[in-house]
Amino acid sequence: MSDMNDKKTGADKNAPAMTGAKAAQENGSVSITLPSAAGAAPTQVSLAKALAAAQQHHAMREFDDAKLIYQLILDVAPDHADAIFYMGAALHQTGDTAQGVELMKRATQLNPRAVALNHNLGMVYEAIGDMPAAIACYRQVIANDRGGHWHCTLAKQLTDAGQLDDAIEFAREALTLLPPHARGIAHNQLANALTLKGELAEAIANFQIAISLDVENAMVNSNYVLTLNYQSQPNLAAIFQEHKKFGDKFESFVPRMYVNPLLAKARADANADPARRLRIGYVSPDFNDHAVGKFIEPVLAAHDTTKFEVFCYYNKNRVDDATKRMQAAAAHWRMTSDMFDGDLATTIQNDSIDILVDLSGHTGLNRLLVFARKPAPIQVTWIGYPNTTGLSTMDYRITDAFADPVGATENLHTEKLARMPECFSCFKPPSNAPEVKALPALARGHITFGSFNNFAKITPEVMRVWIAILARVPGSRLVLKNWCLDNDRMKTFMLQAFAQCGATPGQIELWNPNTSNFDHLNCYNSIDIGLDPFPYNGTTTTCDALWMGVPVITLAGVSHVGRVGVSQMSNLGLQELIAKDTNDYVDKAAALANVQRLATLRGGLRERVRTSPLMDAPRFTKNLEAAYHNMWNAYLSTQKS
């Protein structure tokens, strides 16, 4: 049974008891009599003051009191848009989202020019996953307020929805509307959309401008270093230095909790038993049906609870079936998205966490500034990001000898590399995945290659190599599919980009995204061979393809970001799918385009994956727990000296 953080979720038990209300008409204006504590004189106030009182209760999460006053206002002013809206918000916050959204929507219809109401409704739609409705609200906001900052909000939502060209247009418009000193966030939003579109040089330039305008914005700095990983010809030493700059900059801004040697010694002396039950804390916004969730969920379920007490610090309000499964597997569950970095760090320290594990790196909604404060004696980064965090306070990065060969990448990390004996992660396939069907080439008469990765990974060099493969395999096709292809503008852009790299009409097929994971996976039943991008490999996309019987050709890079495929194929015993350079990549893809060979490989691939280290959660978790014990023992030895 998971324990929940003790954040107040209902009316304060010590709030005054409600005794009654009435409406009065005074000098042509409506007033109401507010309920009061028992024995106290009732207070007659204007509707504006009543609304303010209700909102004060609302802000304190005293929802019952707030709703009572909202209703009193509506009893005498049934079309009071603010009271309707905030009554809906309170209903949403207390579990009645359907009714709450209806009320909030009605309020915006009554007052369509209310910027705050439309913006807040957009945020609610965003939280419940209705992105089209959220975007419609943000567009209405811009129709009423063209100050520029709302354009940035809309650009972000359009980017998240894959409407990249629209996002770019609104971000560029924001740059014309905002004063120069306030344009940092617009440059950041523009860069994010450009990154996902694959226009990396312009994206990096805009990130650099954004940082110059907003030096201490950690999110912008994280977005920048993340995007550096996508470059076609990366300078790994320079990329490491940019990550290290992040660490140096933001560690200098925050108080570090474990720099006090007396505190560290007291903690070690009190917990010096190397065999005791360790407290492990996982920090992530992805404890849900997200790519990272597919790798952490099997570990949470397999942890030895007699030796490890697991805390999950969840940095998002979204709750789905995967969230519920992970929450059930954890001993303690903390909802942290509303917590400031310092408050979360204090919570973690008060929980006496021994080993704190970051599952985000520099990806969205990370809490690296919590790790910069060093709230736990041992801090580790794992699975969410294929590079160093740049933090000196991050002690270890979990990897394996395939993704980070011994001696090859230590100089590119601020962390010590903790290598798993087999693979660095363990994947949980969806329980409702479709069955693997017969090789599509048997019915179609031609080979279909495919990649379902995001376009930031598909650089012009990748396009040229993939087109060379199509030239080697007569009649073959290449299918691209991802969440940004739900609009004709993006399809036209990608077809033109491939044409500029030598593709001929009909060679490239662009498929729309699917609304269900089952339908998404079923698309692999139309793919014969998967192609892994480089130098930034796929991870979840490769696991999905393999689970659906689709072998994936990968190119061995120099560092982790380009060697994930090496780890995956090596752990499957499919080293013949690992290319040493681009020419070898083309050769291996062409050689694999043999119908008989493919049909045989496809027929046994799911079982091969199922029985491999990639999906053996108990085996992987045992290795991970051994690594945690090694880290703890090493820490204890340093405290004794």
For each feature predicted by the language model, list its residue ranges.
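Thr-Gly-centered strand-to-loop micro-motif
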Residues: 82, 358, 452, 481, ...
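Substrate-binding clefts and catalytic carboxylate motifs of secreted carbohydrate-active enzymes
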Residues: 450-461
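A conserved nucleotide-sugar
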Residues: 307-309, 467-496, 500
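Short alpha-helix at the nucleotide-sugar/activated-sugar donor binding site of glycosyltransferases
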Residues: 546-547, 570
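Nucleotide-sugar-dependent
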Residues: 363, 532-541, 555-563
